[in-house]
Regions:
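Expand to "…catalyze enediolate/carbanion chemistry for C-C bond making/breaking, isomerization
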Residues: 1-159
């Protein structure tokens, strides 16, 4: 089940929802949440509920949550909101119009330079026998693997 979280209570219960049997992903019903709470669409105002969903998803061992849709046809606003969602740890965005897809896909895709870094890191890691050298290798390995998976999914090649 894709659990659509649309209220203050839903945000506060996101952890238990993420751990519920059958739930495979959380999504943010941002418009209904704003109506429920009186919150503006401002990035700062929306950071808390988005972050709660990211943390709840992690605790529930789910993929990163899906952000709510952007209303309107302004691609700069859509791009900005998509980039903010990604910066907070969300991994997708609901769409209201098929014309939003290319903008969202570009915003959530890794850059070519990120892909180059990731593949170089992974190649070096393999070349040294998959040995973890220090405490920073594990987080970098996880980041590199995530970037590589996304690059493969989006068909992005390194520089």
């Amino acid at each position: 089940m894709l659990a659509l979280i649309e209220s203050a209570l839903g945000i506060e219960e996101a952890r238990s929802i993420a751990q519920a049997r059958g739930v495979f992903r959380l999504a943010f019903g941002s418009g209904d949440y704003r109506r429920d709470t009186g919150t503006s669409m401002d990035d700062l105002a929306m950071a808390y509920p988005r972050s709660r969903l990211v943390v709840a998803s992690r605790i529930g061992n789910l993929p990163g949550p899906i952000d709510g849709p952007t209303v309107g046809s302004s691609h700069p606003i859509l791009r900005e909101q998509s980039e903010m969602a990604v910066a907070l740890g969300l991994t997708g965005k609901l769409c209201l119009d098929i014309e939003q897809l290319p903008v969202i896909n570009e915003a959530i895709s890794p850059t070519k330079s990120d892909v180059t870094w990731a593949r170089d890191f992974l190649a070096d890691f393999e070349a040294r026998g998959r040995v973890i050298r220090d405490g920073s290798d594990l987080p970098r390995l996880g980041r590199a693997q995530k970037i590589d998976r996304l690059a493969t999914a989006f068909g992005i090649t390194p520089i």
